[in-house]
Design a protein with these regions (language model features):
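Long, acidic (Asp/Glu-rich), low-complexity accessory segments flanking structured domains
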Residues: 1-56, 63-248
Length: 248
């Protein structure tokens, strides 16, 4: 009788172990944000871009005749401070909240301002807070934070003439700071110091932007990856976050 009881207890223990390990898969946490590359989109229909899976979007913001922020859908010549082919920044926020979430990944929004009107940039901040507040995180300098800590979150990056506006404190990353660089494709393709750029991308973020005026949209988009540049706005890679070492 004792051996039967022992056998039953052993069987019950095996069942518990199976239930613990087989039915509940072990979660593997991903590495740091700066350890992943992401292909992105710019000057593209935003709902279409998001629905095909991109997690990196850059918008070029201008001020309309009412000082409202609008996003250009076509590249403008350098120095222009207006755009005719545009959508409202408010609509961009609505598209993001409707189509980009929920997700296990963050959504990166890069904002390039082409206006010096603080009232317009303050409106950008207002629309973000009104529409996307529950997905926002106010952490700063997040390059080395775990990617999984930003699941279902919006990561904001910008720079330049947003200093002193309501948008500035909402940013997680800024290419005006030392830990982030925004390079043109030509700058990433022909860095002045390739070794220094490769070292920089070990713990920092580089975002690579296309140069339509130099017709680089059709160039090999993956070349900057050789130096570790993470965020490529016109790469042809599959959407999502890809571990850099897996590209070797």
């Amino acid at each position: 009788m004792k051996w039967l009881l022992a056998a039953l207890l052993a069987a019950f223990f095996v069942y518990l172990m199976y239930d613990t390990f087989a039915e509940k898969p072990i979660l593997v946490r991903r590495k740091r944000l700066c350890d992943y590359t992401a292909s992105g989109s710019v000057y593209e229909d935003i709902p279409t871009a998001i629905k095909r899976g991109i997690r990196l979007l850059e918008v070029h913001v201008y001020s309309d005749e009412r000082d409202q922020p609008v996003v250009s859908m076509v590249p403008q010549n350098s120095g222009w401070d207006f755009t005719d082919d545009n959508v409202s920044f408010e609509q961009v926020c609505v598209d993001i909240v409707n189509d980009a979430f929920p997700s296990k990944d963050p959504f990166i929004l890069s904002i390039v301002s082409h206006t010096d009107k603080s009232v317009t940039i303050n409106k950008v901040a207002e629309h973000l807070l009104t529409t996307l507040r529950r997905h926002m995180t106010y952490e700063k300098n997040i390059q080395t934070a775990p990617l999984d800590s930003f699941a279902n979150k919006l990561i904001l990056i910008s720079g330049g003439n947003i200093h002193g506006t309501a948008l500035e404190p909402l940013l997680n990353l800024s290419w005006s700071d030392a830990g982030v660089r925004r390079l043109s494709y030509q700058q990433a393709l022909h860095p002045r110091d390739p070794s220094e750029l490769a070292r920089f991308t070990k713990d920092h973020i580089v975002i690579v932007a296309p140069q339509p005026e130099l017709k680089t949209l059709t160039a090999n988009p993956n070349t900057p990856l050789a130096f570790g540049c993470q965020w490529n706005l016109f790469a042809r890679d599959p959407p999502g976050f890809v571990l850099k070492s897996s590209r070797a």
